[in-house]
Amino acid sequence: MQVEVGQIVNTHGIKGEVKVKSNSDFTDTRFQPGEVLTVNHQNHEEQLTVLSYRVHKGFHMLKFEGINNINDVEQYKGDYLYQERDHEDIELAENEYYYSDIIGSTVFDNDNQPIGRVINIFETGANDVWVVKGEKEYLIPYIADVVKEIDIENKTIRITPMEGLLD
């Protein structure tokens, strides 16, 4: 199974580097040189091997083997990057989850009332924040005081909302 790890949002420079918006965790591992990513370009899967990786102004900058100029990489703008899930050899600590396990989960409050579905995750430094789409969009911090139970198998999450969190 493949998991989405980012989207190529633009080119950078003239030597074939791309600007990637990550929607994944463990980017330092996923994007390291030698890692193989899949791009689904015009309904055709292509394997791209990372040649170099760096972070620049909040974006992940990747260069792929065999792509040496802007013309070779321009075609991939807007395409999504994927990586094999079974390739994930990242050891998770207790209460750590892959983004792909959390995104798509339904969030419930203490009264078992659905709040919405996790549609995105972003890192703030101190903790992750989950974007939950329900009647409106909620930002749920992934902290022990709020997130009480995560059931990966059933894709459900139970939270105890702090005052004002769902206003």
UniProtKB/Swiss-Prot annotation:
Its lineage reads: Bacteria, Bacillati, Bacillota, Bacilli, Bacillales
Q: Which UniProt keywords apply?
A: Chaperone, Cytoplasm, Ribosome biogenesis, rRNA processing
Q: Which family does it belong to?
A: Belongs to the RimM family.
User: Can you name a GO cellular component term?
Assistant: cytoplasm
Output the Pfam families linked to this UniProt entry. Answer: PRC_RimM, RimM
The job of this chain, per UniProt, is described as: An accessory protein needed during the final step in the assembly of 30S ribosomal subunit, possibly for assembly of the head region. Essential for efficient processing of 16S rRNA. May be needed both before and after RbfA during the maturation of 16S rRNA. It has affinity for free ribosomal 30S subunits but not for 70S ribosomes.
Subcellular location as annotated: Cytoplasm
Show where the PRC barrel domain sits.
94-165
Task: Give a GO biological-process term.
Answer: rRNA processing
Question: What does the UniProt entry state concerning the protein's domains?
Answer: The PRC barrel domain binds ribosomal protein uS19.
Q: How does it assemble?
A: Binds ribosomal protein uS19.
Q: Give the species.
A: Staphylococcus haemolyticus (strain JCSC1435)
The name under which this protein is listed is Ribosome maturation factor RimM
What GO molecular-function term can you cite, just one? Answer: ribosome binding
InterPro entries in the record? PRC_barrel-like_sf, PRC_RimM, RimM, RimM_N, RimM_N_sf, Transl_B-barrel_sf
